[in-house]
Amino acid sequence: MNPTREECSVAPTLFAPHTIRGVTLKNRIVLSPMLTYRAHEGHISDWHLIHLGKFAIGGAGLVFMESTKVDARGCTTAADTGLWDDSFIEPLTHITRFIKRHGAVPGIQLSHSGRKARTSLPWEGRAPAEAERRPDGISPWELIAPSAIPHANGHPMPREMTAADIKELVDAWGKAAARAHAAGFDVVEIHGAHGYLIHQFLNPNANQRTDEYGGNLENRMRFAAEVAKSVRRSWPEDKPLFFRMSAIDNDGWEIEDSVALAKLLRTMGVDVIDCTTGGMAITPVNASVRPLHYGYQVPHAERIRHKAEIETMAVGLIIHAEQAEAILEQGQADLIALGREMLHNPNWPIDAAEKLGLKPSGAMVPDSYGYWLDKRNLSGIGAVPSTWRGGERTQTAKPSSGT
């Protein structure tokens, strides 16, 4: 019989610590940034603390705050979180302190929706919203984009950005990064994917400018590069900078474009490319062009990792522990991001550890939980939970006091 990993004292790669610049993650598991649409005029609430805190307790190494807007006009909905003003800093410190207290690293994604801004909530149909339904601090809720091209039929026409608009937003990203540092975040991710503003500049169909920000690939990458440079200048040298890109979008942006962009961003101080896809084309044909299957975006992370010589994060229908471990072992990516699977099971890291032959420890399960799980495991009734192998703390079973 072969010895287990536990007996060999060899940790799976998924649970090996990983250092980027001056920040060490306890494992390679990342909560992907996901919009929850629970903010009020950009400000967070207890919802965000409880929502994000449970993933830190559940064992993730890096917990990302959702897409947070650098400019009020860039909100996808009126319920987006914001970081365009100093008033947002102090409430966010409660989240970052809690995440750190439970052994995870807090990260935040900074974004602007461009022509995809000003919509109703997803469960309200995501239809164009009236300009009057704006977050506090802007009047009117103006749509801006690289070119005066609407996101889709029936959506309002955005105003083409001027050179002054571009400079203003490049600066806004840098200022938001400085606020993120003040709020206690240790990782920043620039959102350059899913059809939002930076992606709009990259895509030749959304960007039909004739100045230095449009036309050939070099020009279309200029805005992304300037944003990355601005953020890196405002962000501490010892803290990692991520960039999320749609590796392909089925609407004019291809994998070799992403490789070129990743190479450029690496020179701007970006450390990790978060590899997703899509977000620009909105027609039903999208699904047939890019059929979904487990790990369907992983090959893009692998290609960018090796061709651009930069660390990558894989995301998209990664749900099994063995699947995640294989991605890392085969050199396809450096980090594993989970979104909806973590919503389904915030304790996914604990489950994954056991499935990969590790005994979950106090570093993964809070003592407040582990004590009771140990007790149930050793009670002799056979009710062993799937997420815990007990016995580390309690050597003998004792009668329960009921409290």
Model-derived segments and spans:
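Flavin-dependent oxidoreductase catalytic cores
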Residues: 2-403
